[in-house]
């Protein structure tokens, strides 16, 4: 328990907001999660989701977030109700020069042999990483946050001043709206992602990713009952509508990489806007009606970075505990 529990409002109930709320409530703070989207509507629900630093910055600070998150997901995978499974798969490079820095964080990675690679692939690496079924995981995580005593308040926060008097600290995990709410950051932009969800009637378990594919990013992520097939990564594209031709292209690329996908039933087409920024913003921000911790700009790696981010948010809150609201 902190020496001076704070009243903390977390803005955002995606995977970053819920993870932060979990760590803050577990530390004994009085937490309220302010949200304007149901779990099924938020971009986190569109995530594949695989532990992989996709569109994430390459820095020592980010590496720590990655490692801390990986350790937590591995721990949680021991509990089936979380929706997390550790699965082996292949990260493929069709072009040379791919960033392999993430492999130093994952135990047991190994170089793929030429026989393992799809046609035209330059190289590949085998790894066992967490695969998260988000429809299960987000519900489980919200339930845990509620069990820890946090409250949830639906509504849109348009100005941080709205929260003065009702909170000692704000955690801003609002994704694309993060910079807008702070008013000092116009560097946040969307990276549009479109995916197709297939029925996993063939009980596939091995994942495959190629974020360096010449014809477009491709990934096949088998989960417990479905397979997420992607995708797109179009920067500054605000279109939230499904583009039918894009889905056709996604499935054609994926079938070349994993022929077993042929004939599987299409369950759903989904679009999400990843909240990107050149660097993750994870810091105490002064100069507002009350203290703010910014936690946004995770790009396509929100799930991958979520627990490390949450732990850092809790550390920053502990540093602020006992300080009066400005």
From Swiss-Prot:
Subcellular location: Cytoplasm; Secreted, Cell wall
Required cofactor(s): FAD
Pfam families in UniProt: DAO (PF01266)
SUPFAM superfamilies: FAD-linked reductases, C-terminal domain, Nucleotide-binding domain
EC number(s) per entry: 1.4.3.3
Amino-acid positions noted as binding FAD in the UniProt annotation, renumbered to this chain: 14-16, 36, 44, 48-50, 157, 274, 299-300, 302, 304
Assigned keywords, A-Z: Cell wall, Cytoplasm, FAD, Flavoprotein, Oxidoreductase, Secreted
Keyword Transmembrane helix: no
Temperature dependence: Optimum temperature is 30 degrees Celsius.
PANTHER family found in the cross-reference section: D-AMINO ACID OXIDASE (PTHR11530), D-ASPARTATE OXIDASE (PTHR11530:SF11)
Family: Belongs to the DAMOX/DASOX family.
Its biological purpose: Catalyzes the oxidative deamination of D-amino acids with broad substrate specificity.
Name listed for the protein in its UniProt record: D-amino-acid oxidase
């Amino acid at each position: 328990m902190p020496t001076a529990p704070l009243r903390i409002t977390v803005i955002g109930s995606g995977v970053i907001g819920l993870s932060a709320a979990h760590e803050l409530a577990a530390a004994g703070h009085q937490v309220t999660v302010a949200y304007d989207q149901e779990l099924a509507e938020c971009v986190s629900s569109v995530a594949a989701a695989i532990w992989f630093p996709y569109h994430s910055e390459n820095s020592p600070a980010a590496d720590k977030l990655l490692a801390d998150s990986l350790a937590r997901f591995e721990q949680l995978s021991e509990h089936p109700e979380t929706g997390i499974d550790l699965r082996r798969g292949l990260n493929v490079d069709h072009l040379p020069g791919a960033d392999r820095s993430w492999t130093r964080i994952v135990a047991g990675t190994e170089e793929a042999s030429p026989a393992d690679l799809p046609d035209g692939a330059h190289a590949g690496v085998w790894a066992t990483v967490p695969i998260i079924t988000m429809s299960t995981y987000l519900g489980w995580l919200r339930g845990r946050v509620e069990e820890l005593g946090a409250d949830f308040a639906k509504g849109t926060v348009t100005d941080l001043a709205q929260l003065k008097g009702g909170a000692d600290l704000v955690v801003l995990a609002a994704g694309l709206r993060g910079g807008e709410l702070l008013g000092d950051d116009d560097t946040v932009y969307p990276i549009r992602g479109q995916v197709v969800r297939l029925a996993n009637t063939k009980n596939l378990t091995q994942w495959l990713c190629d974020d360096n594919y010449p014809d477009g990013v491709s990934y096949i992520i088998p989960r417990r009952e479905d397979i997420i097939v992607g995708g797109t990564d179009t920067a500054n594209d605000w279109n939230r509508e499904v583009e039918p031709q894009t889905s056709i292209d996604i499935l054609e690329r994926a079938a070349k990489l994993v022929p077993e996908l042929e004939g599987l039933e299409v369950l759903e087409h989904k679009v999400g806007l990843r909240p990107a920024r050149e660097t993750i913003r994870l810091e105490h921000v002064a100069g507002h009606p009350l203290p703010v911790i910014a936690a946004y700009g995770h790009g396509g790696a929100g799930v991958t970075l979520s627990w490390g981010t949450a732990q850092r948010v809790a550390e920053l809150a502990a540093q602020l505990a006992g300080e009066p609201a400005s």
